[in-house]
Amino acid sequence: MLRTIALALFVCTVLVFTLAHTGSAAYNPTPTPFVEPEGCWEPPADYTREWVNGQQLNKRTLAMLDHAQALYSAQGGVLDFRLGLTQGSYTGALAASFGTHDGGGAVDLSVRSLGDFSIMTAEIEPMLHALRLAGFAAWLRDTGDLYPNSPIHIHAIAIGDLDLSAMARAQIDGTFGYLRGFDGLPQVDGIPQVDRHGGPILCQWMLNQSFYDLRGQPVPFATVGGTTQPLPKLP
């Protein structure tokens, strides 16, 4: 009887500790068994830079973007990813991006119609799914998510890109990262925000490069900023 009571108290203590550090049970998702989804394709390790629609990307990122386009278009998608580029890589000194676009592997995409500038709401989830399947950590940044009246767009970081800035890499597997089931945005209170678009999509090539489903795993280097990087000053 005493052992049963002690066990119950232990379980309750663990539950209280978990909720206190995560805010809710939603912040402690668990990984699912790995089954490689159809459409996975390992990008080439080509870091030659080129300009596309006024934005600079390396060829690895561009190949991933084009693969995502093919996946998305095959499902009836109507937006053009190259034409929709609003920010590329290697663009430092942009405060709103808090360093994520300073290196390679980062892209922002418009979700608006080129015809009438309306938000193409029905295209957003198919775009995100295709980008994630192609190897990006990708999320919708809705209006006002980053600062008052910040424009709606998709933000994507190429998993495994060797040119990633430290802040971009943190969005993949840092405290607030995609592979941990979160939205990639550092929070002043230190509590990660759950990914609104579901869990990460993994391919075998990502596992081969040691990128795993980290949901529910302890976070290394748990500094104030959530990674080895200091917490940036958000606008």
What is the role of each PLM region?
Residues A20-E36, F221-P235:
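Ser/Thr-rich, Proline-interspersed low-complexity disordered segments
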Residues A8-T18:
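Bacterial N-terminal signal peptides
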Residues M1-T4:
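Positively charged n-region of N-terminal signal peptides that target proteins for export
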Residues R49-Q55, S97-F98, L114-P232:
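Catalytic cores and adjacent binding grooves of peptidoglycan-active enzymes
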Residues C12, G23-A25, D108:
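Cleavable N-terminal signal peptides
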Residues Y27-L146:
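Secreted/periplasmic proteins that engage bacterial cell-wall peptidoglycan
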